[in-house]
Curated annotation (Swiss-Prot):
Provenance organism: Mus musculus
CDD domains: PTKc_Syk (cd05116), SH2_C-SH2_Syk_like (cd10401), SH2_N-SH2_Zap70_Syk_like (cd09938)
Compartments reported by the entry: Cell membrane; Cytoplasm, Cytosol; Cytoplasmic vesicle, Phagosome
Catalytic machinery residues: D488 (proton acceptor)
Chain spans, region Interdomain A: 107-166
Domain SH2: 14-106, 167-258
Protein name per Swiss-Prot or TrEMBL: Tyrosine-protein kinase SYK
């Protein structure tokens, strides 16, 4: 999305941010307009795109750089590049469609920072409000949702933010739009946008010399929006921004957003009851002073005597009150927050957690088919009747015939760990049942283990895998902060709720550390998954969050290998010898270099120099934001 792509260019001295074409030309004039002088700016048409402005024969030439679906950048019909900087470097050696070679970058003057676009100023608040309203999340659940799904939320907000803008009137008729525009002031350039039909087209209604003009806004096959024969835009707010600077095919520029009738009539409680205007020439220069209004608070009225044509008292990018559109869920793919396992079932204050987490067996129904089995027994799908809802659950059932007290102790130890954990990226325990067998009742993750899912779905793209391993790193960061060591982190113990939602499971080997401890020391060597273990675990029986980081590196290797077994064909002792020699597993085929570099960082031999999950999660997050957008 725009924000992350722009962030990746901010370090370039010749990147000017969200400036207009005219501003770019002024800068090139300042630089002497010599052939090959160039600068880079943010695209005002395409989300995540850029524009290249080049001087040649005393004229400025402009090229749109679009971000492709695979995350590369290209001028239309040209070669794809990993970044805008790479594209500029290439065209300094090959014109390849440009009017001339790029010879000299025009750098920002001292003290000048890249100009911020209107969406960057508002998106954080819009995202937060959208997540709060849509999923009723608060606190850590809200923060986790924003971090893990930020690219998707940015895209969602960018393409639907118009629903919250005062100039968007939704599904009203042509006649209604004319009546609305003609109410109140008759300022030239007063406008509104309405939805025309279900095909995604709109209409711009513009007041000029007392008449209402109608311009159709069509959506092409690629989703771009434009008036007939006009420039194409990714979003309505970009279109409005553009035509507030220049008419460019309209009879005049957009000047005054036409408010909804309730606000125009000055109804009590309407957020913008005062008639207002803003001067022509665009929105970006004025949006810097924007502050997101607190719920229930009006923005202060302009001081008396101020000149309405030159002083802005109405921000066209200020969201109006009210909920987001009801059809939004139909326009996007499901996010983790849409599932019933994103929040704990006990997050609802009306759902009372049973004392000592023991559940009533009569409220639990089990299916006959097994989801899986192991030394402990079996796992079955079930349904648990809570106070308000019936919850789909996974039930780990202890073998009855063995009557082994050690197995029971292990199950209860796992339950003891799980009852203390509450995070969207960790399988939560609902409770335990003592009936025909001991049962551990947990959240259900329908798609099963990550390794098996990837083995069967090799079409899954890298960015989807990065999304999932990032979620695992978020869950592990939570464990680290909560002073728990997992000790069995592997792809087989990551369960998928959906193709885009992973949860860490299987806490049978997990240990809680005391506040004064940073590692757990086992007394004896058990049935350990040695191929996932750090050297200090094997050599000294020491386990910490840093040893979980080593295991996470192996999990990443499994994920990018589409579920292959690590160190295939090797015995545990051979793996240990290999690690002692400083050797590591090779890069999986097709795995991004940045991800393999992170694996090797996780496999740092010296535990003191190995990063913790705070650093690992942040590095993954930044890379994930970059490739997904």
């Amino acid at each position: 999305m725009a924000g992350s792509a722009v962030d990746s260019a901010n370090h370039l001295t010749y990147f000017f941010g969200n400036i207009t074409r005219e501003e770019a030309e002024d800068y090139l004039v300042q630089g002497g307009m010599t052939d090959g002088l160039y600068l880079l700016r943010q695209s005002r048409n395409y989300l995540g795109g850029f524009a290249l402005s080049v001087a040649h024969n005393r004229k400025a030439h402009h090229y749109t750089i679009e971000r492709e679906l695979n995350g590369t950048y290209a001028i239309s019909g040209g070669r794809a590049h990993a970044s805008p900087a790479d594209l500029c470097h290439y065209h300094s050696q090959e014109p390849d469609g440009l009017i001339c070679l790029l010879k000299k970058p025009f750098n920002r003057p001292p003290g000048v920072q890249p100009k911020t676009g209107p969406f960057e100023d508002l998106k954080e608040n819009l995202i937060r409000e959208y997540v709060k309203q849509t999923w009723n999340l608060q606190g850590q659940a809200l923060e986790q949702a924003i971090i893990s799904q930020k690219p998707q939320l940015e895209k969602l907000i960018a393409t639907t933010a118009h629903e919250k803008m005062p100039w968007f009137h939704g599904n009203i008729s042509r006649d209604e739009s004319e009546q609305t525009v003609l109410i109140g002031s008759k300022t030239n350039g007063k406008f509104l946008i309405r939805a025309r039909d279900n095909s995604g087209s709109y209409a711009l209604c513009l007041l000029h010399e007392g008449k209402v003009l109608h311009y159709r806004i069509d959506r092409d096959k690629t989703g771009k929006l434009s008036i007939p024969e006009g420039k194409k835009f990714d979003t309505l707010w970009q279109l409005v921004e553009h035509y507030s600077y220049k008419p460019d095919g309209l009879l005049r520029v957009l000047t005054v957003p036409c408010q909804k009738i309730g606000a125009q009539m000055g109804h009590p409680g309407s957020p913008n009851a005062h008639p207002v205007t803003w001067s022509p020439g665009g929105i970006i220069s004025r949006i810097k002073s924007y502050s997101f209004p607190k719920p229930g608070h009006k923005k202060p009225a302009p001081p008396q005597g101020s000149r309405p044509e030159s002083t802005v008292s109405f921000n066209p990018y200020e969201p109006t009150g009210g909920p987001w559109g009801p059809d939004r869920g139909l326009q996007r793919e499901a996010l983790p927050m849409d599932t019933e396992v994103y929040e704990s079932p006990y997050a609802d204050p009306e759902e009372i957690r049973p004392k000592e987490v023991y559940l009533d067996r009569s409220l639990l129904t089990l299916e006959d088919n097994e989801l899986g089995s192991g030394n402990f027994g079996t796992v079955k799908k079930g349904y648990y009747q809570m106070k308000k809802v019936v919850k789909t659950v996974a039930v780990k059932i202890l073998k009855n015939e063995a009557n082994d007290p050690a197995l029971k102790d292990e199950l209860l130890a796992e339950a003891n760990v799980m009852q203390q954990l509450d995070n969207p990226y960790i399988v939560r325990m609902i409770g335990i049942c003592e009936a025909e067998s001991w049962m551990l009742v947990m959240e259900m993750a329908e798609l099963g283990p990550l390794n098996k899912y990837l083995q069967q779905n090799r079409h899954i793209k890298d960015k989807n895998i990065i999304e999932l391993v990032h979620q695992v790193s978020m869950g592990m960061k939570y464990l680290e902060e909560s002073n728990f060591v997992h000790r069995d982190l592997a792809a087989r113990n990551v369960l998928l709720v959906t193709q885009h939602y992973a949860k860490i499971s299987d806490f049978g080997l997990s240990k809680a550390l005391r506040a004064d401890e940073n590692y757990y020391k086992a007394q004896t060597h058990g049935k350990w998954p040695v191929k996932w273990y750090a050297p200090e675990c094997i050599n000294y029986y020491k386990f910490s969050s840093k040893s979980d980081v080593w295991s996470f590196g192996v999990l990443m290797w499994e994920a990018f290998s589409y579920g292959q077994k690590p160190y295939r064909g090797m015995k545990g002792s051979e793996v240990t010898a290999m690690l002692e020699k400083g050797e590591r597993m090779g890069c999986p085929a097709g795995c991004p270099r940045e991800m393999y570099d992170l694996m090797n960082l996780c496999w740092t031999y010296d535990v003191e120099n190995r990063p913790g999950f705070t650093a690992v999660e942040l590095r993954l997050r930044n890379y994930y934001y970059d490739v997904v957008n």
